[in-house]
């Protein structure tokens, strides 16, 4: 199981060229053998944006009368195949929370051009993406009409994993070792930043373009020495397979890299025209994730029921890990801290990694979360 990689689907330049209807769904992977700072409430200009031709008029308004008892139909698009990032969604579905809220939710796989493209077009109302992957969607003359409305996981759990004892428990140790790169500007800039902050020389890291879909096999076979993983899946996969590893998290080296990954994104017109339905959906979804926090084993069973092809041992272990990560130290599940959100985009702006500056407070809202 893995997340859809921005690195695999489109380069940043190609994404910026998609003026019509989309951007790649995500960057980074939960791949595998097995994949608060001060609160500042900021009004999101993206959510206030008027309807554009990109939306295609797909999102229905609440002003359109429904027959008595008819449920509001919503489409939720995943970023990749079902995994523990999505557990709360499946829990809410299985336990009838959406139905109780008057909603009929269809969960679908992403198209080739990604989840955000489908949400921006209005063909899906909600989906999964990542803050770093959303940057190209926002850094353009005509930003895609989507808004991040919840953080699935409160802190960035990604980092570099390697075989234990080979000196890569800190970034400088990546010197003279093979790193499997997606060859993306943001990715390489982040690696360079942490290596150099640790006193190393990024030019000495051996970059081999490769998309690793099985960390355990890649590390055991010594195809590569270091891999970017999201620990909830790739890291846990090495534990489940009894492979000793070293690991460092990006956020522990540079706090600006504690950005939000993944997030729930929503169509702006749907948020504007169907505010009550959007809030009802987010309230039901929050209940699903809260249940996953309280009962990780039960939540894992629900996910495995929905996606029986998954490795149940890995799912159970990943769920146990994520019970402490979904909300972590936030005041409630889903809350997005403005300082951290803006901090990462500010870093992209300062390092010329966005084609157009992303303004502070842009692209997210906590307005639709239950209070």
What are these regions (language model features)?
Residues 2-26:
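Sec-dependent N-terminal signal peptides of Gram-positive bacterial secreted proteins and lipoproteins
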Residues 214-217, 222-307:
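Pocket-lining segment of extracytoplasmic ligand-binding domains
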Residues 273-350:
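Secondary-structure end/capping motifs
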